[in-house]
Amino acid sequence: MITLRPLLLLVAFISFSGCATNLHSSASATTPTATYQPGELNGETLFDILSAELAANQDHYDYTLKKYLKQAELTRDPNLAKRAASIAQYLRDTQALSKAVKLWIIADPSEPEPRQILANILITQGKFTEALPHFKTALDQGQGKALLLITSQLGKMSDTEVTSYIELLEAVDIDASLNNDRLVSLGILQRHLKQYDLALQNFNRALKSSADLPNALYQKAETLKSLNRYTEALSTVQLLLADAADDRQYNALEIQLLFLLKKNKQGIAKIDLLITKNENDVPLQNYLALTALDFNQLDKSKSILEKLLRSSPINSSPYFYLGIIAERNDQPLQAIENYLQVDSGSNLLQAHPRAISLHKKSADKKKVENITEQLIASHKENQTTYLLMLADWLNKFEFRQDAISLLDKNIQLQDENPALLYTRAMYLEPVDSPAAERDFKRVLALTPENAVALNAYGYTLTVHTNRYQEALTLIERALTLPPKAPATIDSMGWVLYKLKRYEEAIRYLSQAYLLYDDPEVASHLIAALAGNNDLERARQLFIKISNSPPDNKFVEQARQSLESK
């Protein structure tokens, strides 16, 4: 293997010497014609590195990266690969960085740093299975940074992927200096899978080795909380607070535990103390208000939220939570007023529908229409959401024709709005299935991969026509797309029942019922069981759903399925 470190030093010297010659574009540069000889320091390598460093001296880093990647690949020199990786990191070019570190690993398999970098890249990209061998090699070579990264990505990992990392961490022969980090990471992964007892064992093993590991203590406290061992959890977090009294994470956990232990006065006192110490910290005060709300400490939550509104009237977000408090206090008019005062932020489209939903009488129709009109005028960007909100309210209170007329009017203005078309189709389906079918077709012309519309159209065909094979094709397509909702699985079972493919129907309908034990799904499963002459299971399921309201039409349909046998 050639060693280019002296050449890199020479190039660095030339770069810092302030060469005044401007770098020509790559198109105008003339590359030496010498034939490249792998493993030798030849003219092409020298020319590329010199031109790359001169380019870097003039901030042309893309050119520099291109040349270093080329020569790293040709020479298999680890120093060139490392330089390419460094430039790619500076440019935040993940694709180039992946290529550079892979070349670096090939050039120097014993070097741990590129393994660490590659593991980090793959983990960040969510390629957890692909990252696993590099993660292991990095640990074997004493690189522990990936432990922190993998625990930070748990929300993106499947249970199978988490299990693979648990098995690796249980088996890996790791440097003693990293063992406590391994145990804590292992415990965090196990806690994610709700393996609380195993997680607790690993946190305790780490603490036995070093009694003052903050992360191990904190994770232990959280695990004890998950096991409902609140007193032990409180004692553990208070050990942390003895050395870090102002740590927000520790204080937040202590407050939760105080409320869980019904020590409400102490919890409120702790909230007051934190607010006094952090009078200008709006995010902290907002968090404390929501914590109080979570534990139904409504008066305390309300007082903090009202204080936040006084200090910053322009921020309307607290009104959303004041609306929730008013609802819990059985004050619907106050709740409506609060919800409607939310005029921006992430809760806007939760607040306004909640305000509408609190109008619980058909006599409120004019009021609801006026509110919706005002909301559309104030928030034109959310017009579709508000129209659907109003249509849903009208349909719920048996103003179906008014809901359809509302959608007709707005579809004339927005004839390519799939949400309006889909909603009208759903309202038309019970009363005018051909019109509903036309709308479903328009929705699918606009959004061909719309799994919800594919399912709804397919199910409509099973209910109103005998075009079962066409319905099956639509529902099969829906099942290949996300989300694989229980409703789609139910539709698949139902169309198979219509096709008299009873055993297949039972498999799908049983799966749907496990996911969503609704009387409609149950009635479909009972029909399929009866069709397959499995009357005992059908009767047992009917007994289970017969406690539904006596006028439930699906219970009656299930009864008819049994009586027909």
Question: For the regions a protein language model found, what residue spans apply to each?
Answer:
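Disordered, low-complexity tails and leader-like regions
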Residues: 3, 25-27, 104
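Short, low-complexity, disordered segments immediately C-terminal to signal peptides
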Residues: 24-34
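Alpha-solenoid helical repeat scaffolds
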Residues: 21, 36-57, 66-565
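C-terminal motif of bacterial Sec signal peptides marking the signal peptidase cleavage site
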Residues: 17-18
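Flanking scaffold residues of small Cys/His-coordinated metal-binding clusters
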Residues: 11
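Bacterial N-terminal signal peptides that target proteins for export
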Residues: 1-8
